[in-house]
Amino acid sequence: MFALSKVLRRTQRLRLGACSAVFSKDIQLGGERSFDSNSIASTKREAVPRFYEISSLSNRALSSSAGTKSDQEEDDLEDGFSELEGSKSGQGSTSSDEDEGKLSADEEEEEELDLIETDVSRKTVEKKQSELFKTIVSAPGLSIGSALDKWVEEGNEITRVEIAKAMLQLRRRRMYGRALQMSEWLEANKKIEMTERDYASRLDLTVKIRGLEKGEACMQKIPKSFKGEVLYRTLLANCVAAGNVKKSELVFNKMKDLGFPLSGFTCDQMLLLHKRIDRKKIADVLLLMEKENIKPSLLTYKILIDVKGATNDISGMEQILETMKDEGVELDFQTQALTARHYSGAGLKDKAEKVLKEMEGESLEANRRAFKDLLSIYASLGREDEVKRIWKICESKPYFEESLAAIQAFGKLNKVQEAEAIFEKIVKMDRRASSSTYSVLLRVYVDHKMLSKGKDLVKRMAESGCRIEATTWDALIKLYVEAGEVEKADSLLDKASKQSHTKLMMNSFMYIMDEYSKRGDVHNTEKIFLKMREAGYTSRLRQFQALMQAYINAKSPAYGMRDRLKADNIFPNKSMAAQLAQGDPFKKTAISDILD
């Protein structure tokens, strides 16, 4: 029997016996639709606890271990695991970094959510573009339906295989808006008989483009007969991706009420959630998995590897890898890449390169799937020779993701001209490059503070008819912040927020909020804090830390800050507690004591 919680205890990095339950039995989401409890017959499995009961499980199971550490050790653990900001990635992490190395609910969606025909996706993922995909990409942004009508009139046949190819290729390029328009057109024109998987894909795309609330509205319109486990799994994954704890717990409990068996996927989603929000609760989920005899999946191990690596606990990460070996779990390319990234981030160059050589195998050409990660990680190690070696192999006929990885890699190596040359090649080959292509080069300009080139690139992007998506806005906003033009970045944020098709990335707000915080500009820091809520982002410790720092830098009393934290169900870690003490308006000093 596996015991990952024991592995975590051996590394002495998780406080398993002291996790406090904060979930309510009756979670009410104000102003939101409730989920239809009659959508599927319920066969209750009482052995599976609801999510608000999970924390008490760990307290009972490990009560003897609670309180065995000193208060100082407890604080250190809490500070090290409760927030990603305390890790080596720090506050300066960008969205591109996340795309490269971190696990997310979106990263595993093709494999885990099962939204696309599995046999089709595996065979066609690296093949040439489908004709349906080409038609959709070449059409103006809001005219996908007209383009598809014309395509059918020309005698082309719409088949499941062609749809699956196009959908997969659109998703891989993050063209979610076009994919959603295709899905809606297919149903409206009765080109396919809709299945639960089709509706789940629609739900997933709706949330990605229009937000979680619109996704819930979409779910209400889906026929009850199609509201099965796949649909709820998709909703759960999107609640997790949004970092919405209450809604994630609500869906988790709803799945239990509907009689769906507790699965590895469901537990993995809760692990992903707590990896971002409250790492102390990771132990609770692992204990639940042990109690219900749910064997960890490959994603479970990846999450734990990422948690350990992000907090620079390399010995703990290696123990997780050893456990995988003992359990006979084979490392895939993604797990190897994740491990190599954390070795690189910890400055363990030799260990990182050893893993990369294992990824290459005996025949590098035969391991084409690894090229994207190899380019990125070799660049992070400063190995220009290795980046050029890998790129030379695929340069004549590169896959799209390899080209993007090469642009990033050469950018990291300060080879901006090489990055620009690859970009131009993509534009020439595709004729109509996607927003993600522009965003990657734009981020290279951001990293090198090339404001003028960045502006020209965005102008060129707009002239090409390519829609400016969230990743592009994120890079552009950061570009202005890095150039010291914070007010201009704030203006861009306002403009981007008004685009109904775009949900801005959390980092886009934080770049500006951090700058206002450094200035001690309480008014504008509070304004960005409010904008994040309006955009649908739930408050996290990270935002409150920036907000509190603004009050400290302004030497202004932060009245009611503890109550605000409590209202958002956020518990301060060690660094936040120090900020609260520093900014306490009722703080006693030696002089005040004398005056009293």
From Swiss-Prot:
Q: Which UniProt keywords apply?
A: Mitochondrion, Repeat, Transit peptide
Compartments where found = Mitochondrion
Coarse class of the primary localization is: mitochondrion
Which spans of this chain does UniProt mark as PPR repeats? 228-262, 263-296, 297-331, 332-366, 367-397, 399-433, 434-468, 469-503, 505-539
Annotated region described as Disordered, given as residue ranges: 62-119
Molecular function terms in GO for this entry?
A: mRNA binding
Q: What is this protein called?
A: Pentatricopeptide repeat-containing protein At1g80270, mitochondrial
